[in-house]
């Protein structure tokens, strides 16, 4: 029963932190230090990534009309939604950098960089970057205010920022891509939406990679924990995505920058005082 409660808590953390620019993987790694699950290391590696599938389903449900590229309902319009197909090609372009590094160096990165101190440093650095870019953009008008206006060059640049998140836990995939978008003149709302859509192939691919590597030969209890975590992550993600899209219509991302810096300092303090072991 206790492990079920832990899976619920992990699902809540995933659902909240996957979409806010504060690093879901970083929070899960830190939470695991204080409340580890009584499961095999193999299952934990799968759980940490595959739980994200619940969060992906929330994006698919909320933005179905913006991402489904076929028209089955309106006979007066083309069957293929060319604007959505174009969007998906741009998303695939943005996926290339992280996909290449993930396939080649997944095991190395997992072994050497998934540490509390790395998470802390990246929390602070990206937090500072958010404060800087929001101050820098304060009097500027966004160059890209519609999703369809993102160019292939913009998509590739955002993809390079995503690569940083793929390498360093604590960066935040959503944080890195939103930050990249803001730096090249994409509006907050468009940067957030593109980030949500970009998560679909990236997180699905990461989950598939883990399943290919480790399989699903787990106990019934472990599979139950995975299912519970995914369902909770899905429900919480629905609420958080709606909140974020409403929030950034009137506010900037500074609050997340401050949160990251404060949390990063706390984690470093815990590390150097021996509270955290890695």
Give residue ranges: language-model regions:
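Multi-pass membrane proteins that catalyze or facilitate reactions on polyprenyl-/lipid-phosphate substrates
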Residues: 1-278
């Amino acid at each position: 029963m206790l492990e079920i409660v832990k899976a619920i808590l992990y699902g809540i953390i995933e659902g909240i932190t996957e979409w806010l620019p504060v690093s879901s993987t970083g929070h899960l790694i830190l939470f695991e230090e204080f409340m580890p699950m009584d499961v095999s290391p193999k299952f934990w590696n799968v759980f940490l990534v595959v739980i994200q599938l619940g969060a992906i389903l929330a994006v698919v449900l909320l933005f179905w009309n913006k991402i489904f590229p076929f028209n089955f309902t309106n006979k007066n319009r083309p069957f293929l939604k060319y604007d959505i197909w174009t969007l998906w090609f741009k998303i695939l372009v943005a996926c290339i950098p992280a996909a290449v590094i993930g396939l080649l160096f997944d095991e190395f990165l997992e072994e050497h960089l998934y540490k509390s101190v790395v998470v802390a440093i990246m929390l602070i650095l990206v937090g500072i970057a958010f404060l800087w870019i929001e101050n820098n953009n304060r009097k500027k008008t966004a160059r890209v205010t519609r999703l369809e206006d993102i160019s292939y060059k913009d998509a590739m640049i955002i993809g390079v920022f995503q690569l940083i998140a793929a390498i360093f836990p604590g960066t935040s995939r959503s944080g890195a891509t939103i930050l990249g978008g803001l730096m090249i003149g994409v509006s907050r709302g468009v940067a957030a939406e593109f980030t949500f859509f970009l998560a679909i192939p990236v997180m699905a691919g990461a989950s598939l990679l883990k399943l290919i590597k480790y399989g699903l030969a787990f106990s019934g209890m472990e599979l139950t924990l995975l299912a519970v975590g995914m369902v909770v992550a899905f429900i919480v993600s629905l609420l958080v995505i709606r909140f974020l899209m409403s929030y950034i219509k009137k506010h900037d991302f500074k609050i997340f920058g401050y949160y990251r810096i404060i949390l990063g300092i706390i984690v470093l303090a815990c590390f150097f005082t021996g509270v955290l072991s890695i």
